Amino acid sequence: MSFLLLILVFIPLINFISIWFLEILWGKRVAIWIIAHSYIIIVILGLIGLNKVSSGVFKFFTLGSWIKCGIFVVNWGFIFDTLSVSMLLMVGIVSGAVHYYSIGYMESDPSLIRFISYLSLFTFFMFILVTGDNFVQLFLGWEGIGLCSYLLISFWNTRVQANKSALKALVVNRVGDFGFLCGLVLVFYFFRSVDFSIVFVLSSFFTKVKS
């Protein structure tokens, strides 16, 4: 079941990469049709996963370590529980609806493929944000969302207002980045770990000691 949910997480990334090749092979209409209908698969997998984890069973999936520096170790891992899978399902439904609406609204736009690819990448980083099992991976998802927000807002880059709005969003996100990084440093300073499972256990222990 964890493997199916892991596939769900990476479907938008596959869409982001493959849509360009699909357009070359079969044309824009077929490429967009395939990408849009992939969200039906995402919703189905999300419903199956939610049914499996609704009993309160936590599922962890670790692909390996990607940062090792002394005691600072960050794993490329995912946690699938009721909360994260519910968020996966909700994001998948909303993103699918946005994809379908965008395809209809921008049907005549020559850059529709590029817009859909940005949407797919945005969805992928949303999935990373809600399923990551540590604060660094959460930060990666947050940064990716900020980048994709800028790309989507400035999509029509010939419009002055679109560029201004994109720049404003980028600046505001950087303020959030600073607060996020400060919190991340403090978490590692006090708990010597950035893994959610370790931090949550130790934080509850500190609370009991304090009381």
Language-model-derived ranges and their functions:
Residues M1-S211:
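...captures the hydrophobic TM-helix bundle architecture rather than a specific catalytic motif
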